[in-house]
């Protein structure tokens, strides 16, 4: 075996990092709306279909509001926040498991004072995310709970 099979967790100083894993921007700036998110691909192999990634949303940050045909599972590893899944908003905290069904609008938001870190398991080959149209976003905002989620404390 030429490669070390262990990627040691090296985030002892408060940063959640793994040895030999590159810290990347969540997505290209300006490509889609999000705030203060990073990602790390922890596991990907050509002989397996799955991919395990770690995302971290900084305090008061959020992931992209999106949907896609593929299902994915998310386990919260750090912090607390909220997740929108469809028309429902749920509080999430460490070790909660969130299942995102196919073609379901979803977004993760960190709390105001601490980051929200989570593992995300998806197919390595997957469809591209879809963003809501202005009409779809307006329809979502008609739900008062969702509208509050999108605009916490007047954000």
Q: What is the meaning of each model-derived region?
A:
Residues 47-50, 57-62, 80-82, 124:
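Short, charged/polar surface micro-motifs in flexible loops or helix N-caps
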Residues 73, 87-103:
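Short acidic-glycine-tyrosine-enriched beta hairpin
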Residues 1-49, 134-155:
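A short, N-terminal "cap"/entry segment at the start of jelly-roll beta-barrel domains
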Residues 36-37, 52-68:
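Conserved short histidine dyad/triad with adjacent acidic residue
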Residues 39-40, 54, 89, 105:
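Short hydrophobic/aromatic beta-strand element in the GNAT-like acyltransferase core
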Residues 61, 69-70, 88, 104-105, ...:
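A generic "binding-loop/recognition-motif" signal
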Residues 70-72, 76-81, 86:
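Glycine- and acidic-residue-biased ligand/ion/polar-headgroup-sensing regions
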Residues 46, 82, 93-94, 102-129:
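Ligand-binding loop in jelly-roll beta-barrel domains
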């Amino acid at each position: 075996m030429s490669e070390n099979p262990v990627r040691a967790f090296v985030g002892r100083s408060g940063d959640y990092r793994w040895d030999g894993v590159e810290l990347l921007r969540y997505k290209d700036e300006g490509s889609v709306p999000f705030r203060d998110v990073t990602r790390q691909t922890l596991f990907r192999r050509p002989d397996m279909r799955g991919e395990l990634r770690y995302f971290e949303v900084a305090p008061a940050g959020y992931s992209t509001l999106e949907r896609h045909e593929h299902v994915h599972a998310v386990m919260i590893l750090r912090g607390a926040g909220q997740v929108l899944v469809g028309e429902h908003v749920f509080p999430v905290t460490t070790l909660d498991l969130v299942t995102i069904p196919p073609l379901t609008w979803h977004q993760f938001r960190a709390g105001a004072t601490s980051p929200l870190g989570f593992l995300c398991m998806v197919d390595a080959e997957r469809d591209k995310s879809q963003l809501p149209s202005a009409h779809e976003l307006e329809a979502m905002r008609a739900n008062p709970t969702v509208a509050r989620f999108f605009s916490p404390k007047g954000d």
